[in-house]
Structures are given as C-alpha cells and as structure tokens.
A protein has these predicted regions:
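Extreme N-terminal tail/first-helix region
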Residues: 1-18
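A short, mixed-charge helix-start or loop-turn motif at secondary-structure junctions
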Residues: 2-6, 104, 145-149
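Active-site rim elements
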Residues: 3-6, 45, 108-109, 152
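Acidic/histidine-rich alpha-helical segments that form the ligand environment
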Residues: 16, 22, 80-133
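Hydrophobic alpha-helical packing residues
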Residues: 17-20, 24, 55, 59, ...
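Short, contiguous alpha-helical
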Residues: 31-85, 128, 132-176
C-alpha cells in the first residue's frame, strides 16, 4: 500500500506527542501556564495543535483541486530536507507571520482532548486521501514551501521536535 510510510509517520507522530505530554507529567497547572519566559508550555501545546489542525483544513481545501494540484518537485524535496534539519535543531527564530498567539487558557486535560480530536482528524484525512494524488504538492509549509502529504506529516513531526527544545528550556527556567 502506497500510504504505508505515511501511516508509519502517524504512529511516530503519536509517540512523540505522548513524549511531549510526559514532559508535563510532573508540573502543576500553575507551572504549565507560567508565561514568565515567553509562551507557557500549554501555549506551546496549543500552538502545535493549531498548526496541525490548520494544516489539515488547508490540505482538505487544496485537495479539492484533485489532479490540478502541482507535482511535488525535486526542489521541493531539497527545501523540505533543509527545513527538516533546521526544525530538528535547537536554533531559535521568530514564528512565521501566519502564526497567531496561541491560547493558554486550557487545562492539560482539555488540551489533550483537543489535540486528540485534531489527531483523529489528521488520521481520517490520511485514510481518505486518494493514492493517485500522493505525489502532489497539497501542503504549503511556511519555510519549506509546497510539500506532498508525506512531507506534510513529516513536518508535523519535526515541528514537534523543534518545540520539544522550547519545552526543555521552559522546564529549566521554572526549575524542573
């Protein structure tokens, strides 16, 4: 099945989301919402959820173009690999202008529930995605440019890894 590598990425995405949540297991709600050092940990989770849900909404809309979608190119693959390397690093940079201030008023339980709904929508999107469009550039990443579905799901993984560094910094600053 041509989507098998994408399903494997979804399993990895789930595992790494759980890793992110484990980083909050020993924190109080007060610590999770502490904005003394920029975004709180809950805001980081909210940002990741908003990025994933917004991406799925965007791709759902773009997929309506069907065969008119452009091909995922070699240059696109190159830009994706560069972006992947940057996202896996601990380097910091300003978020793209399309990123809004994430909500920080969720409890950890509410955040998990919201993100679980988003993840379920992501899985349903992948399951319903037509195999004949797998090589099409259905997603526009703010840095990498146009990506295919596998690249989009991969970018969710690397985006989470990037913010894992941020959560580690926040934990260190609050003395954890």
């Amino acid at each position: 099945m041509a989507k098998q590598p994408i399903f494997k990425k979804l399993v990895l995405l789930d595992k790494e989301t759980e890793d992110l949540y484990r980083m909050a297991d020993d924190l109080s709600e007060e610590e999770l919402h502490d904005q003394s050092y920029g975004w709180s940990i809950i805001q980081v989770y909210s940002h990741l959820n908003m990025a994933e849900s917004g991406s799925i909404r965007y791709m759902t809309k773009k997929m309506q173009a069907g065969d008119k979608l452009g091909q995922f190119t070699s240059f696109g693959r190159f830009r994706y690999m560069l972006t992947k390397g940057l996202l896996q690093s601990s380097l910091r940079w300003k978020a793209p202008k399309v990123v809004s201030q994430p909500k920080g008023d969720f409890s950890l339980k509410e955040m998990r529930e919201e993100w679980a709904k988003t993840r379920e929508a992501t899985k349903q999107y992948v399951e319903a995605y037509p195999e004949h469009l797998l090589n099409r550039a259905v997603y526009k990443h703010p840095f990498a440019g146009r990506l295919d579905l596998a690249g989009a799901i991969g970018s969710f993984i690397y985006h989470q890894r990037h913010h894992m560094h941020q959560i580690k910094r926040i934990r260190k600053k609050i003395g954890r």
